[in-house]
From Swiss-Prot:
Top-level division of the source organism's lineage: Bacteria
Cleaved signal peptide residues: none
GO cellular component: cytoplasm; cytosol
UniProt function note: Attaches a formyl group to the free amino group of methionyl-tRNA(fMet). The formyl group appears to play a dual role in the initiator identity of N-formylmethionyl-tRNA by promoting its recognition by IF2 and preventing the misappropriation of this tRNA by the elongation apparatus.
Organism: Synechocystis sp. (strain ATCC 27184 / PCC 6803 / Kazusa)
Binding site for (6S)-5,6,7,8-tetrahydrofolate: S112, L113, L114, P115
PANTHER family referenced in this protein's UniProt entry, alphabetically: METHIONYL-TRNA FORMYLTRANSFERASE, METHIONYL-TRNA FORMYLTRANSFERASE, MITOCHONDRIAL
Keyword hit for Transferase: yes
Gene3D superfamilies cross-referenced by the UniProt entry: 3.40.50.12230
Protein name: Methionyl-tRNA formyltransferase
Gene behind this protein: fmt
Record keywords, A-Z: Protein biosynthesis, Transferase
Catalyzed reaction equations: L-methionyl-tRNA(fMet) + (6R)-10-formyltetrahydrofolate = N-formyl-L-methionyl-tRNA(fMet) + (6S)-5,6,7,8-tetrahydrofolate + H(+)
Length: 330
């Protein structure tokens, strides 16, 4: 029986915890998660998704503000005498004191093909940068930020219309399977850790407010990648208001073969449509049942789904029908 302590916080970490809880050869001794946070109306304290799963399973949950400084939690972790600490999107760095506690090490599930996209937002930046492939890497943790020796990898393609939610869900499931296999192989002495090549490392920093602002002078593909990579947070100025851009479709013969079947009617309509000329950020036409087409710095972009202030998300077609006056986001 492999004794583990699980460190994790968001939805992305839940499938891995569930896989550990459901495995007959793995004993989850405790879960460490970020403290409950106040959210929503009434500012109620909301537990993390990982905590909710652990509580339902009857597993002890520890929630220190700073795990490396909480003597009570450190003592509990040491007393566990675990074989592994498993870390998935926990949200805090582990101290050297913690890293040496488990018998076989601290194993991290990272949402990228290391050494590419080390850091806090690997999925977001992989999509925003237009990568066509990503994946999950398990690694033995060291004191650095995602710099530990690699164990196993699994890959997944990124389609032109895949967004953060779709890729995140896919990697969460594949990462859970990969983690279980990693623990089994490590326990059996069948894995040889592979050091990362520093010269190949790239980074995925925390997102800043400016990352969500759309610059219409960029190309249609760059804006599309930004929107789907940082979904659903990208936005543009709309008069004196802010319009959230939830999803887009890049238009052009080079993109249509890469679009799912449901967009083929859109492709046909676009190729048969006479568009006006315009400056980046101008609406240069409307495709029936789909929505407005915008000029960008290079190419045309359809607004598939948007969210006006104070309203629920709506299709680009509904948005344009409700705002018939001239609209520009320039």
């Amino acid at each position: 029986m492999m004794k583990t302590v699980f460190f994790g916080t968001p939805d992305f970490a839940v499938p891995t915890l569930e896989a550990l809880l459901g495995h007959p050869d793995i004993d989850v001794l405790a879960v460490v998660s970020q403290p409950d946070r106040r959210r929503g109306r009434g500012s109620k304290l909301i537990p993390s998704p990982v905590k909710e799963v652990a509580v339902q399973a009857g597993i002890p949950v520890w929630q220190p503000e700073r795990v490396k400084r909480c003597q009570e939690t450190l003592a509990k972790l040491k007393n566990c005498q675990a074989d592994f600490f498993v870390v998935v999107a926990y949200g805090q760095l582990l101290s050297p004191e913690i890293l040496v506690m488990p018998r076989l090490g601290c194993v991290n599930v990272h949402g990228s093909l290391l050494p590419k996209y080390r850091g806090a937002a690997p999925l977001q930046w992989a999509i925003a940068n237009g990568e066509t492939e990503t994946g999950v890497t398990t690694m033995l943790m060291d004191e650095g930020m995602d710099t530990g020796a690699m164990l196993l990898k699994t890959t997944t393609p990124i389609g032109l219309m895949d967004n953060l939610t779709a890729i995140g869900d896919r990697l969460a499931r594949s990462g859970a399977e990969l983690l279980v296999q990693t623990l089994k192989d490590l326990d059996a002495g069948q894995l040889q850790p592979i050091p990362q090549t520093e010269t190949e490392a790239t980074y995925a920093p925390l997102l800043k407010k400016g990352d969500f602002v759309i610059n219409w002078h960029r190309s249609a593909l760059e804006i599309h990648n930004q929107v789907r990579g940082f979904a659903p947070a990208c936005h543009t100025a709309w008069g004196e208001q802010i319009l959230k851009i939830i999803s887009t479709v890049p238009l052009g013969a080079e993109f249509f073969p890469l679009l799912p079947e449901k967009y083929q009617d859109l492709a046909t309509a676009y190729l048969n449509y006479s568009l006006e000329a315009g400056e980046p950020g101008n609406i240069i036409g409307t495709i029936k049942n789909w929505g407005p087409v915008l000029e960008t710095g290079n190419g045309h972009l359809l607004l598939e789904q948007v969210q006006p202030p104070g309203k629920k998300p709506q299709s680009g077609w509904d948005f344009i029908n409700g705002n018939r006056s001239t609209i520009s986001f320039a």
